[in-house]
Amino acid sequence: MLRISRDTKIVARVTHVTKSRTYATSTAPKLVVGLEIHTQLLTKRKLFSSTTVPSLSTTPNTKVSYFDAALPGTQPRLNPQALLLALKAAIALRCDVKELTAFDRKHYFYPDQPAGYQITQHRKPLAINGKLKLNWWDLYSQNEWPALLAKEANTDSADTRDLASRSIDVPILQIQLEQDTGKSTYHGSETLVDLNRTNMPLIEIVTAPVIHTASHAAAFVKKLQTLLKRIGVSTGEFESGAMRVDVNVSIGEDGERCEIKNLPNTSSIEAAIEAEYNRQVELVGKGGTVEKSTMGFDGKKTFILRSKENAVDYRYMPDPELPLIRLSKGTLLKVRDSLPELPDKVFSRLTDDPYYVTTKDALTLIHVAGLSDYYFEVFERVSEETEDAKALKQPVNWVVNELLGRVRKADEARAAESAESGEPDLGAHDYNSIYPPAKLAELILAVHNHQLTLPSARLLFQHFLANPEDLKNMTIEQAITEFELGESGDVVDACRQVINEHESVVKSVKDGSKPGSIKFLIGMVMKATQGRINPAVIERQLKTEMRHM
């Protein structure tokens, strides 16, 4: 890494003093929050050079072009893929995309910005005036859902409101395309600089300061993550640095705002907002003033890092090496047509006829990239073979509980190994490759048609996940024969053994004193056969054996 002594002084040029404000304390001030969200785009190359994007495990300073390092004579060349992804985000967020957009230089001096300026968009951003809708299921925790739904069902209640009315629209002021900076790491008196991240493509999404609770701010970020993953613009991961969030907090509509930088997750976003609000209220309550500042957050409290610079300090100027970009209506239509079905529409489809997925499962399918499309295909294949309502409920159970559950357990195991080796393994999954939808539908139908019991199907599913070659080459019928999973003749031996071991129970069933006790006998046979045999088959065989006693 590049090494810079901490003794080196890097001083920002201050040309304007921010005015402080004092607030009346007769009533508790309103919390006002705005968000600035930086999201890395899923491109193969950097924003203004042909360098391929690095991974988390890439050796420091090995993915750096001459332009990334700001060597004299190098010039930027826009990556069109980054522009298209930024347009997808802007359209999905219902923004007005500008016909003309341009790049500016934002000047400041810092070790991880070798050019002395960042290429961003200040005067002519890519898009403005968007919005993101937060529905009731976005705004309320799952623990609150039962009470909300019960209240909604109680039409006699005077204060009952349609759940749809609980949604809010968060305005988006602008979306701009810009380059990322390098990464600084501090060790004692030295600063280590890794330029791999320099010139990575970002979009900055700026909301209006209209959010009034910390939980709503976190809900906005979660919803945005889901949307960007759904349309293939970004992974939205905090862990890998693909998303970084700054929050602006003030008290009262005219309050001076303080910016909290680079919060690492949604829990920290909530906690930092609440801590900063309490700090400002306490400060004003003691007769102090809130000054425009950049804040840090240590997990419990916020603290002042530096006085906030005004925009004039950055000395914005048009980038003379990048031309204006003119976007045609045809280009925007093509981008719009390339968008997949957006999360809110997918949710509405999942919870309606013929799927009737629960709210909880619908959100799981939406939040996990690629999983809702996978579910739809499994459902369609099952529904082609049967209209049985019970069978049609099985695809969501298998996709959410069995497939996703086992994939997540495998991820946790790999993450633990990666933590030990220092090489994190992050990223989305291709569920079609892990377990093809046709194969899962075949397994579900085998249970429905009594070829397999549910425990046997789960065992077979687990085997196929661990042995992809068997999954690829073996049919369900072959697997039933190979692993002796069918309703084989050993049911006779198992039934006879259970009857001999539980004579008193058998007697109570036969004489009619306790006919329900046959369920106990069925359970014992299922235990003896490891759940491989259908309970109905076991019951028939038990009754046959008892008749011949």
Swiss-Prot record:
* Enzyme category, top tier: ligase
Q: Where on the tree of life does the source sit, at the highest rank?
A: Eukaryota
Keywords (alphabetical) are:
ATP-binding, Ligase, Mitochondrion, Nucleotide-binding, Protein biosynthesis, Transit peptide
**Listed Pfam families:** GatB_N, GatB_Yqey
Q: Which SMART domains match?
A: GatB_Yqey (SM00845)
- EC identifiers of the protein: 6.3.5.-
This enzyme catalyses: L-glutamyl-tRNA(Gln) + L-glutamine + ATP + H2O = L-glutaminyl-tRNA(Gln) + L-glutamate + ADP + phosphate + H(+)
Listed Gene3D superfamilies: 1.10.10.410
Kindly list the biological process annotations in GO that this record carries.
Answer: glutaminyl-tRNAGln biosynthesis via transamidation; mitochondrial translation
Q: Where in the cell is it found?
A: Mitochondrion
Q: HAMAP family from the entry?
A: GatB
Database matches in PANTHER family: GLUTAMYL-TRNA GLN AMIDOTRANSFERASE SUBUNIT B MITOCHONDRIAL AND PROKARYOTIC PET112-RELATED, GLUTAMYL-TRNA(GLN) AMIDOTRANSFERASE SUBUNIT B, MITOCHONDRIAL
Instruction: State the name under which the record lists this protein.
Output: Glutamyl-tRNA(Gln) amidotransferase subunit B, mitochondrial
Tell me which species this is from.
Yarrowia lipolytica (strain CLIB 122 / E 150)
